[in-house]
């Protein structure tokens, strides 16, 4: 039996690192409205927490039989669950949470991108960013920490240099990647457990010109794969990168258990960009896959 928790503020809570982190009012309201979302993939016997009820009675007897499955882990969620009556030893310790925080930053994705031959780097000054712009011609800039789909900037925004200075001041660096035109956005969803990664399925979605999520594209796994293969100049690359992540994700984090979503895209000329983002938590893509 599992205890499911929908905490959509997880990215920023993890970035904060503070047990006392408080999400913005609109995010708190969103969580209250949608706390039942995990029912879409939960088993009938599972429990979905409303974010308010005491949980102490669930751990009074046979506590180890109940698996805690949040949208994502952070020190703030651990603190919240402690206040609700969950024993501290049933949750990740400080060392595990620290490793997850480092892994979840966009700087860790850059390390994977470089192995895959993708033009991406972490810049620690505006001059570094300008150098990337000169070298690559068109770039997308990302804050190392932000909520999902946020923290992105393009040079067509007249205030982009001020944005870079602010992110450098607040977070110490800015992630810069060569900007690619996109024909199709999609993600591969994986589940990690016991040092192994299992491929779960594909999620296709649409985005705006700045890469912000708009909506998922519905279809069976076979229909989605057929759609992608028809757009690729090298169809074999899809299976190749799927196997690459099955093998490499456990090497990146052998201690991690839970969902992993890898965002990818196909360019107008059919080239596969195999790693746009890596999300070490639940995603709406995984929700779509589990709901099939």
Residue ranges and their predicted role:
Residues 2-39:
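N-terminal-proximal low-complexity accessory segments that begin disordered
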Residues 27-43, 48-134:
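Conserved N-proximal alpha/beta basic substrate-recognition cap immediately N-terminal to
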Residues 29, 200-223, 281-283, 290-292:
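Extended active-site and interfacial segments that coordinate phosphate-rich ligands
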Residues 113, 133-154, 172-182, 262, ...:
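ATP-grasp fold ATP-binding core
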Residues 120, 139-163, 184-187, 209-229:
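Glycine-rich phosphate-binding loop of ATP-grasp-fold ATP-dependent ligases
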Residues 157-214, 261, 265-275:
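Phosphate-binding site of ATP-dependent enzymes
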Residues 197, 235-292:
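ATP-dependent carboxylate activation and anion-phosphoryl transfer catalytic cores
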Residues 203, 210-254:
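A conserved active-site cap/scaffold subdomain adjacent to cofactor or substrate pockets
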């Amino acid at each position: 039996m599992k205890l499911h928790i929908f905490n959509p503020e997880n990215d920023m809570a993890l970035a904060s690192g503070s047990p006392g982190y408080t999400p913005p009012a609109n995010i708190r309201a969103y969580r209250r409205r949608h706390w039942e979302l995990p029912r879409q993939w939960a088993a009938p016997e599972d429990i979905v927490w409303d974010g308010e009820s005491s949980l102490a009675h669930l751990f009074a007897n046979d506590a180890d039989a109940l698996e805690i499955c949040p949208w994502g882990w952070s020190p703030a969620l651990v603190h919240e669950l402690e206040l609700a009556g969950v024993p501290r030893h049933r949750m990740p310790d400080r060392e595990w949470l620290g490793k997850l925080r480092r892994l979840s930053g966009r700087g860790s994705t850059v390390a994977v991108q470089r192995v895959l031959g993708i033009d991406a780097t972490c810049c620690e000054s505006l001059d570094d960013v300008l150098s990337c712009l000169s070298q690559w011609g068109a770039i997308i800039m990302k804050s190392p920490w932000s909520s999902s789909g946020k923290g992105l900037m393009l040079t067509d925004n007249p205030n982009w240099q001020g944005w870079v200075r602010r992110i450098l001041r607040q977070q110490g660096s800015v992630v810069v990647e060569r900007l690619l035109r996109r024909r199709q956005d999609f993600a591969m969803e994986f589940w990690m457990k016991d040092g192994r990664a299992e491929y779960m399925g594909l999620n296709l979605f649409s985005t705006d010109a700045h890469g912000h999520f708009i909506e998922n594209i519905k279809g069976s796994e076979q229909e989605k794969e057929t759609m992608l293969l028809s757009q690729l100049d090298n169809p074999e690359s899809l299976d190749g990168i799927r196997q690459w992540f099955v093998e490499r994700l456990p090497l990146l984090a052998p201690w991690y258990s839970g969902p992993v979503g890898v965002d990818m895209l196909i360019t107008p000329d059919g080239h596969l960009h195999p790693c746009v983002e890596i999300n070490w938590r639940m995603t709406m893509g995984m929700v779509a896959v589990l709901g099939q």
